[in-house]
Amino acid sequence: MQLTSQAFSYGRPIPKKYSCQGVGISPPLSFSDVPREAKSLVLIVEDPDVPPSVREDGLWIHWIVYNLSPVVSNLAEGAQIFAVQGLNTAGEIGYCPPCPPDAKHRYYFYAYALDVVLSDEEGVTKEQLLEAMDGHIIATAELMGTYEKD
């Protein structure tokens, strides 16, 4: 399975329009080579470079989307999501744009193909979602972009 974006390549800067200094909309994403047996897709976006003074665990969850149809091949920028969304670290549902407080940060977009459709309960945490996904992951993909404020 592969996860790519028309807006940035792996390891390259995420354009400003997708950050807190821009419009703050989600970037376009494309899923390919999804296994035929997949029943749903999950997307988790996180920043592992958060200073300990901001978050002790150094991790910020920017977006959680699950129960995406496995036949979805693209999410347009700022797309309305026809799936279930979980809580980001800000305690909100939806995309939280990159806004690093100190330096360049890495933003990992993780895609998972599952052999099940999960509960439609909205607002779960990453930990709750990972627990529900346990034993059901049949493929994964990763995309990483960076962002640093001007």
UniProtKB/Swiss-Prot annotation:
InterPro entries: PEBP, PEBP-like_sf, YbhB_YbcL/LppC-like. Disulfide bonds: none annotated. Signal peptide: none annotated. Pfam families: PBP. Belongs to the UPF0098 family. This is UPF0098 protein CT_736.
